[in-house]
């Protein structure tokens, strides 16, 4: 990944176990800082300690992460992203797969990204969902094949974000 090549610490090794094409177990190993996130139905752990997302039902209270603004290729995508980014409490650039781990741990509340491949996201789905979060495509559809992704630690926040992104 770009983060690994450039020496940033936000990269990770992603492994997903699929059942009938759906991710049922996900692992993200971040060897630089010695963290391993593992997610299955109803549970996500960091080095064996259970994680939960943070309750944050409104955009104005949310901490948003995105890897890079260049993920938004069209004016419509940039406008949709900006309609959310302009309302959140904090916006953090960078993060790559680590953004989803931070969401599962309750440090950030929302991740919005674009043009992801299946191998970019499949391991992160059980990690987000196991910690209590919601993850989908921008239109609310399942994300398993990659695409334009929105993940939130709170279902109400996810619904509000999807309404802006559709």
Predicted regions: what they are:
Residues 1, 64, 128:
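Conserved S/T- and glycine-rich ATP-binding loop of Class I adenylate-forming
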Residues 1-12:
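Glycine/serine-rich anion-binding loops at beta->alpha junctions
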Residues 6, 73-77, 120-121:
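Alpha-helix N-cap/helix-start motif
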Residues 13-14, 134:
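PAS-family sensory domains
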Residues 14-100, 147-166:
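Acidic beta-strand-loop-alpha-helix segment within the catalytic core
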Residues 79-83, 101-166:
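Oxyanion/phosphate-interacting regions
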């Amino acid at each position: 990944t770009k983060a690994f090549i450039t020496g940033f610490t936000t990269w990770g090794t992603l492994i997903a176990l699929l059942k009938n094409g759906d991710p049922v177990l996900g692992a993200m190993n971040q060897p630089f800082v010695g963290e391993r996130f593992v997610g299955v139905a109803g549970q996500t752990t960091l080095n064996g300690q259970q994680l939960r997302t943070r309750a944050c039902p409104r955009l104005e209270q949310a901490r948003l992460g995105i890897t890079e603004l260049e993920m938004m290729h069209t004016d419509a995508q940039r406008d949709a992203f900006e309609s959310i980014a302009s309302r959140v409490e904090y916006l953090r650039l960078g993060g790559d797969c680590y953004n989803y781990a931070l969401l599962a741990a309750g440090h950030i509340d929302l991740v919005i990204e674009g043009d992801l491949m299946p191998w970019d996201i499949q391991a992160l789905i059980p990690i987000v969902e196991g910690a209590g979060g919601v993850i989908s495509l921008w239109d609310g559809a399942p994300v398993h094949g990659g695409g334009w992704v929105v993940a939130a630690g709170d279902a109400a926040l996810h619904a509000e974000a999807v309404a802006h992104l559709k």
